[in-house]
């Protein structure tokens, strides 16, 4: 059912449009909150698999795939883990990160082929990301993974979708209709990013990559991170700033 503001958006002022978008965005956090039990179950299962030596794969198309890649790419510098621990895969390959590869998401076989390149095994976990829950690339791959005994989860904004039905641990976030009809890069994308933050952050905490709330395993690869490492050392072992600088050669 159309909302009161759905008509004639093009006639509204900039102030009105951004106020309406912001109003809709406020519902996203509450929608995520309603699914915390499902998110908890998924994270605990991923943690168990990682402690067996498993990896985490995010699989998606379009915006969903890009969000998975974004979250995965932040894990090595933030938590000091191998770039092969959390891996984002997008339909159409790396070229789809910058330029849409619209028909890539329709393949029923490419997703499994993409995972096989990483020698996927039963210790790994795969999360399918699809706002609609109908993307063939994702649905078919998650179904295949489950049949192989691989832990499967999904993030979708469409209840009782085909994706939810074929995965082991579905997380369904109902965010209400998008501000622009069908533009799932908006609230659906925001909800997805929030949950990916929860998944990667909580998993890294539970496998020992965080002390208190500090990134104790971050990789010192630039001046900003060097200075951050100095501050972490100061906080955790009460070094003076000067004493911490003396350890630079060992960082």
Model-derived features: positions:
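Cofactor-/ligand-binding subdomain signature composed of acidic, glycine-rich
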Residues: 1-31
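Short, basic, glycine/proline-bearing loop/turn elements
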Residues: 24-34, 100, 125-128
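A short, well-structured juxtamembrane/interface segment
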Residues: 34-48
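Glycine-centered, small-residue-biased loops immediately flanking beta-strands
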Residues: 54
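Glycine-rich phosphate-binding loops that contact phosphosugars or nucleotide phosphates
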Residues: 57, 61-194, 203-205
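Internal, active-site/partner-interface "lid" segment
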Residues: 201-235
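Conserved small/polar residues in nucleotide/adenosyl-binding loops
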Residues: 240-249
